[in-house]
């Protein structure tokens, strides 16, 4: 009896296979196609990821940033590949995409600060407003850039402090790069007493800047009376020099101005104010 049941089961299974042969063949083809999609997608993801990494390294982009962005490209391609494979075997990909979208939204809301810094880091890498080794002012913080990472930028101030600034704050503020241009301009505002001889002051200032070798003579040099101030007449001196010489030129020229003016008897007045008193006579009693 049991032998008959086994035979009947085998016959039933055979009949079902024959009846559903087309359906099984279709499923088999879809599964093989899905596997092929996954294999090809993984190969393409690796090739494109490596190409992106090499491209960014060739453009001297930080290795950490290059690795992160290339990995982001790779996993993005893999995600699309898996969705395509699921669709090939009959899974409703619309619901999968909806779930992934909801999960991504939740993660984005939870990490919006970090994602903002990430997006800002990508923009800094793409547009390169500053590079490691350059002296910059980032939102009021000045120093030498040590590294530009995905989420933050590290810099050293002139007094030796190490400061880490989130990239989101950098993008939202002003970026001043002091190192990008090879030459820069110094400006001096020199105030002298009102009884000083204007021509003598201009001649001394002109001689000082003409004799300074680090000042670029092929650039415009300005020595002009700029303002009649409350306590002094103010001259403006504008000169150009190489960026590396800028600060030393400023200090040395300022010292020479003081020495030359002292030798010529030209004084630098202190802020002063004239106060006039007016006597008011009291009315006599009637």
UniProtKB/Swiss-Prot annotation:
Keyword entries, A-Z: Cell inner membrane, Cell membrane, Ion channel, Ion transport, Membrane, Transmembrane, Transmembrane helix, Transport
Subcellular location: Cell inner membrane
Coiled coil feature spans: none
Keyword Cell inner membrane attached: yes
Predominant subcellular localization, coarse grouping: membrane
Side of membrane Cytoplasmic, spans: 53-67, 112-286
Stretches of the chain found on the membrane's Periplasmic side: 1-30, 89-90
GO MF, one annotated term: identical protein binding
Outcome when changing residue 40 to D/K: Normal growth stops, without cell death, due to increased membrane permeability to potassium ions and protons (permeability tested only for D substitutions)
Phenotypic consequence of residue 40 to C/G/N: No detectable phenotype
Cellular component terms per the entry's GO annotation: membrane; plasma membrane
Result of changing residue 267 to C: Provides biochemical evidence for heptameric structure upon cross-linking
Transmembrane segments: 31-52, 68-88, 91-111
Record bears the keyword 4Fe-4S: no
GO biological process, one term: protein homooligomerization
Role this protein plays: Mechanosensitive channel that participates in the regulation of osmotic pressure changes within the cell, opening in response to stretch forces in the membrane lipid bilayer, without the need for other proteins. Contributes to normal resistance to hypoosmotic shock. Forms an ion channel of 1.0 nanosiemens conductance with a slight preference for anions. The channel is sensitive to voltage; as the membrane is depolarized, less tension is required to open the channel and vice versa. The channel is characterized by short bursts of activity that last for a few seconds.
Free-text note on domains in this protein's UniProt record: The channel pore is formed by TM3 and the loop between TM2 and TM3. After a sharp turn at Gly-113, an alpha-helix (residues 114-127) is oriented nearly parallel to the plane of the putative lipid bilayer. On the intracellular side of the channel, the permeation pathway of MscS does not connect directly to the cytoplasm but instead opens to a large chamber that is connected to the cytoplasm. This chamber resembles a molecular filter that could serve to prescreen large molecules before they are allowed passage to the transmembrane pore.
PANTHER family, alphabetized: SMALL-CONDUCTANCE MECHANOSENSITIVE CHANNEL
Family: Belongs to the MscS (TC 1.A.23) family.
Protein name stated in the entry: Small-conductance mechanosensitive channel
Gene name of the record: mscS
């Amino acid at each position: 009896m049991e032998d008959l049941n086994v035979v009947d089961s085998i016959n039933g299974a055979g009949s079902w296979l024959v009846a559903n042969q087309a359906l099984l063949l279709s499923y088999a083809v879809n599964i093989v196609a899905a596997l092929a999609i996954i294999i090809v997608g993984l190969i393409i993801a690796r090739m494109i990821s490596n190409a992106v990494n090499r491209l960014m390294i060739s453009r001297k982009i930080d290795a950490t940033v290059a690795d992160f962005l290339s990995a982001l490209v790779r996993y993005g391609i893999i995600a699309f590949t898996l969705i395509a494979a699921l669709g090939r075997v009959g899974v409703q990909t619309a619901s999968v995409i909806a779930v992934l979208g909801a999960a991504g939204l939740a993660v984005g809301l939870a990490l919006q600060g970090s994602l903002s810094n990430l997006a800002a880091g990508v923009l800094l890498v793409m547009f390169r407003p500053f590079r490691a080794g350059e002296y910059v002012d980032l939102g009021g913080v000045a120093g030498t850039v040590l590294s530009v990472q995905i989420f933050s930028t590290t810099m050293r101030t002139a007094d030796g402090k190490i400061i880490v600034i989130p990239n989101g704050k950098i993008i939202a503020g002003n970026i001043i790069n002091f190192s990008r241009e090879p030459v820069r301009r110094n400006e001096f505002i020199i105030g002298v007493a009102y009884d000083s001889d204007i021509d003598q002051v201009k001649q001394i200032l002109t001689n000082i800047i003409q004799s300074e070798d680090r000042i670029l003579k092929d650039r415009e040099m300005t020595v002009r009376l700029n303002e009649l101030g409350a306590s002094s007449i103010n001259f403006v001196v504008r000169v150009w020099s190489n960026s590396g010489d800028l600060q030393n030129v400023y200090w040395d020229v300022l010292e020479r101005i003081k020495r030359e003016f002292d030798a010529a008897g030209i004084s630098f007045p202190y802020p002063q104010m004239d106060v006039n008193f007016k006597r008011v006579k009291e009315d006599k009693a009637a």
